[in-house]
From Swiss-Prot:
Annotated source species: Dehalococcoides mccartyi (strain ATCC BAA-2266 / KCTC 15142 / 195)
CDD domains attached to this UniProt entry: Ribosomal_L13
This protein's GO CC annotations: cytosolic large ribosomal subunit
Name listed for the protein in its UniProt record: Large ribosomal subunit protein uL13
Record HAMAP family: Ribosomal_uL13
Superkingdom of origin: Bacteria
Gene Ontology annotations of biological process type: negative regulation of translation; translation
Bilayer-crossing regions: none
Amino acid sequence: MNTYTVKASDIKRDWHVIDASGRVLGEVAAEAAKYLMGKHKPMFCRNLDCGDYVVIINAKKVTVTGNKLDQKIYYRHSGFPGGFRQEKLGDLLKTKPLFVIEHAVKGMIPRNTLGAQILAKLKVYEGEEHPHASQTGEVSKES
C-alpha cells in the first residue's frame, strides 16, 4: 500500500467568511486558525500550507467573557529606553479591533516561516463590507 503525499498542485483553496458580531474572541480566533492551517481538510499536511483564506467581518463587535476588558493587558516595547507600553483590551477594542483579532489568531498559528505564509491569508475588517465578495460564499455565524 502506498502512502499518499500531498503536493502543492493538489491543494484547492476556498474562502471562508466569519461574522464576529456577538461571538467570543477566542472562538472566532480558533475557527479562523483551523481554516487557515487546513485542519478541517482530510489532506491536512503539517509541512505544507494547505489552508484556506479567511475573512473576518464585524471585528468591532467581538465580545470577551469575564472581566477581560479591564484585566487583560497587551504589552509592547519600542526598543528604546523607557519605551515599554501597555494597553487594556477594552481600550484596544475601541481603537484597534483588527489588531486584537489578528493577535489572537497569530497566537494559534505555528511560529515559523510557514506560519507567516498561513497568516498572510487572514483578512480582518471592522464592518460588514469587504472587497472579497466575489471569492467568498456564505457567512459562518457559529462554529
